[in-house]
């Protein structure tokens, strides 16, 4: 039985989350829902897939997040000629003071707390798989030797939705490794005016660290452990499992789901659903998850995991309608 989380620990989590969100928001204008979703995924211990057109602030957002958390940051531009060694690192021959030569491992960009994998779908499947091992195992293997990655390790991969030529579709196994998928909307008129005003001056705003640099990594891991301690009752577990099941084309699913969906969300999707809900519970000041917490993260955690049929594409299907149908069915079954 997990002991109930104290009020002081919940307050500390909320204050830290709010401070980081506010600090990122000082530099990144707009995108408040996306910033909150990305922070939620970070404290849930997962990775995020970001979709947005070029120039909308993806790199600035991720770099500002790393700065606010006082964590190391690395950016890797994925291209068709990028090799796995360009991601993970490689061994090089080095000559010592005694004249002897030996192989030395030179870490790649993946050896950072926060990694921005820009336009990940431009790399070949072989290179994508190198990042997949890092995301799944928190380690990389080079020349038969395993190297652990820094902890926490947080990948934010971007997709450009308007340039599909020369890209490689992400396999379902890799999509399933992302806790959330977040879409960045185009800024409003007022937001665009603020962006232009704040970024064309001599001293544009910068992000100040919220966590102490010396203890930032251990502090982030401590807050992630706190999320795991949030209580989920059997009733809420059943509700979350029902939502996941109703995204698959089973007899219990909605007609729309059976027509559009080839494969529903995986059990890993259910794990992401509950972990995101646990963060939401803490942000609401509670040590336990409610169905409303689950509902709040259902779209971000499940929609990108669905494999749709050709009929869905012909109908111009939106996977978020499938999630809406699953949520409606789960609410009915709950009574």
Q: What kind of region is each of these model predictions?
A:
Residues 94-98, 123-127, 135-215, 221-229, ...:
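Canonical AAA+ ATPase core
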Residues 53, 87, 158:
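P-loop (Walker A) phosphate-binding loop of NTP-binding proteins
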Residues 198-289, 314:
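AAA+ P-loop NTPase domains with strong preference for DNA replication initiators
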Residues 52, 118-119, 130:
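Walker B catalytic acidic pair
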Residues 2-4, 11, 249-335:
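C-terminal engagement/docking regions of AAA+ P-loop ATPases
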Residues 42-80:
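Walker A/P-loop
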Residues 10-56:
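Pre-Walker A (pre-P-loop) alpha-helix and adjacent loop at the N terminus of AAA/AAA+ ATPase modules
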Residues 37-40, 94-116:
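Conserved alpha-helical scaffold flanking the Walker A/P-loop in AAA+ ATPase domains
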């Amino acid at each position: 039985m997990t002991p109930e989380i104290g009020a002081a620990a919940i307050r500390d989590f909320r204050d830290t989350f709010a401070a980081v969100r506010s600090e990122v928001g000082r530099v990144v204008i707009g995108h408040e829902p996306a910033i909150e979703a990305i922070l939620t995924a970070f404290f849930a211990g997962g990775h995020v897939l970001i979709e947005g057109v070029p120039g909308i602030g993806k790199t600035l957002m991720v770099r500002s997040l790393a700065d606010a958390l006082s964590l190391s940051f690395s950016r890797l531009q994925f291209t068709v000629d990028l090799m796995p060694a360009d991601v993970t690192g490689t061994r090089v021959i080095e000559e010592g003071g005694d004249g002897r030569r030996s192989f030395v491992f030179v870490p790649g960009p993946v050896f950072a707390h926060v990694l921005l994998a820009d336009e990940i779908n431009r790399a070949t499947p072989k290179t994508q798989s190198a990042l997949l091992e890092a995301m799944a195992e928190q380690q990389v293997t080079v020349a038969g030797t395993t190297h652990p990655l820094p902890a926490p390790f947080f990948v934010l991969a971007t997709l450009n939705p308007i340039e599909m030529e020369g890209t490689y579709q992400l396999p379902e196994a890799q999509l399933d490794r992302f806790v959330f998928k977040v879409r960045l909307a185009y800024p409003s008129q007022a937001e665009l005016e603020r962006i232009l005003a704040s970024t064309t001056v001599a001293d544009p705003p910068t992000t100040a660290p919220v966590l102490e640099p010396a203890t930032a990594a251990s502090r982030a891991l401590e807050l992630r452990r706190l999320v795991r301690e949030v209580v989920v009752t059997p009733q809420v577990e059943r509700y979350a499992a029902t939502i996941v099941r109703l995204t698959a084309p089973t007899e219990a699913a909605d007609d729309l789901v059976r027509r559009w969906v080839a494969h529903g969300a995986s059990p890993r999707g259910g794990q992401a659903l509950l972990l995101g809900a646990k963060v939401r519970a803490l942000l609401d000041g509670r040590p336990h998850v409610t169905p409303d917490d689950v509902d709040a993260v259902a779209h971000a955690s499940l929609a990108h995991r669905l494999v749709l049929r050709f009929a869905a594409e012909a109908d111009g299907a939106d996977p978020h309608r499938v999630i809406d149908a699953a949520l409606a069915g789960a609410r009915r079954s709950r009574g």
